[in-house]
């Protein structure tokens, strides 16, 4: 029902025009008789009183009809339905809202008949409506992770992992778990687009399950559910499931539990006790399922760790090739690349390793490969600055020198052993002789007797008195060096020394004072040997080296030492021995047969 059309206006106009035309066709005539005379008076159209009377009557009738129509209209409006009135009020309210709303295009959605076109500026893009959800703007990785999150939440029908755990729910949770995680936090991170790959999502999912298994005991419901969800989630997000066409949700080990829980949660918000008992009653079956799939679970964890390592390497070293050496059965080496550009390839990327790939070509005129040792890269731990500073400030051996520190390292092995030994000795420094003896015995057992030998040599070095300067002779070789004279005879009381010290019985002291004539003979012999060495070097340096090893020149007769020379004689005058292993212990004085 709507408003009645005003058709009566057109009808009134037509009737009024007809009415105005009809009286003008034939005017009325009045005849008056006065005193026997007859007066005729014609009345015109504008002065006819009957015309005005008829017209006023017509207007009264028209006004009466208009009142009747208004009355009928008011009566009809009273009988309108309540729904129509409510609809009209809503339409009026919507119109008022459309007038006050901002220019975001809401008027077109409510009133399609009244369209207001607003042209946005060309340099500014049109903003989306705030009330509309931003589902259209989600990236493919977000949609994939949302699908994974929905699948994982179905495994948790009771919402154990839905919200963050507080100390009010689990006492002491914040003290045990330093990095909490739950499905709600993961969903917020998906919406905020904080996950750049599936690996990061898997890391947070594993963190959530590990937190549950760390806080709860293995016989609890939460521990078992976390273990189930962890296994199912890693299987669902594995590489084979992502790249394959099969649905991983259909291959899960417990397919009959999940649909039941989903139906019950749809019907009622709170799950019943029967469902909970059905879910967690067969504990033995649950344990057997997890035990039977332990290998698959470990495989999923290994694949996850490998994916994390590959992503980390590609992020820090893009385009780099890292790998390991693999030896084949025939003895050849292969370099297997770990972070290959195509990890899904059937064959792994390998490179053969041989001598030619590790070295350059031979230079002309040289028969061997050159090797240049960079001295700047050589660092010895015995003479480093940090070691000297850390070892000099101790209460057991104060003011250690470089040679004394070498003794310590030779006895205890490395810096850790030296620090441990010094710490033990400092601990029992003021405890008495018995405690010191126990520590010395312990260090001897650990070092195999090197501790006692080191202590003896260190005390011997520090107990030798220095000779005054006026007693030193000009020709005395000891006056220039000033080094202490060691007595090797003291080592004979240690039978467990690694070196053979039986030959020390025939020796006295290592250094003795030389006669004046013997020193001149030694100087002449040394000068002659140096001259021969200089001539031999000049002769060899002037010749061009051969390109083959077979054509190298042999040692000349001049280079061979004559028989009976001092270099051929040993301590016990044994000319048959080619090389004496204890040559460094010989006395500098010449042997008796040399004078003859």
From Swiss-Prot:
The keyword Acetylation applies. Its main location: nucleus. Residues 1-10, 63-73, 86-97 have a biased composition (Basic residues). Residues 50-62, 74-85, 111-126 have a biased composition (Basic and acidic residues). Residues 543-555 have a biased composition (Low complexity). The modification Phosphoserine is found at residues 56, 565, 587. InterPro entries: Bromodomain, Bromodomain-like_sf, Bromodomain_contain_prot, DUF3512. GO terms for molecular function: lysine-acetylated histone binding. Residues 214-216 are annotated as: Histone H4K5ac H4K8ac and histone H4K5bu H4K8bu binding. It comes from the Eukaryota. One of its GO terms (biological process) is positive regulation of cell population proliferation. Residues 1-26, 38-137, 536-596 are annotated as: Disordered. The keyword Phosphoprotein applies. The modification N6-acetyllysine is found at residue 372. GO terms for cellular component: chromatin; GBAF complex; SWI/SNF complex. Keywords: Acetylation, Bromodomain, Chromatin regulator, Isopeptide bond, Nucleus, Phosphoprotein, Transcription, Transcription regulation, Ubl conjugation. Pfam families: Bromodomain, DUF3512. It is found in: Nucleus. Residues 136-240 form the Bromo domain. The record marks 169, 222 as: Histone H4K5ac H4K8ac and histone H4K5bu H4K8bu binding. The Bromo domain mediates interaction with histones that have acetylated lysine residues at specific positions. Also recognizes and binds histones that are butyrylated. Binds acetylated histones H3 and H4. Binds butyrylated histone H4. Component of the multiprotein chromatin-remodeling subcomplex SWI/SNF called GBAF, which includes at least BICRA or BICRAL (mutually exclusive), BRD9, SS18, the core BAF subunits, SMARCA2/BRM, SMARCA4/BRG1/BAF190A, ACTL6A/BAF53, SMARCC1/BAF155, and SMARCD1/BAF60A. Interacts (via N-terminal bromodomain) with acetylated RAD54. Interacts (via C-terminus) with RAD51. Plays a role in chromatin remodeling and regulation of transcription. Acts as a chromatin reader that recognizes and binds acylated histones: binds histones that are acetylated and/or butyrylated. Component of SWI/SNF chromatin remodeling subcomplex GBAF that carries out key enzymatic activities, changing chromatin structure by altering DNA-histone contacts within a nucleosome in an ATP-dependent manner. Also orchestrates the RAD51-RAD54 complex formation and thereby plays a role in homologous recombination (HR). This is Bromodomain-containing protein 9. It comes from Mus musculus (Mouse). The gene is Brd9.
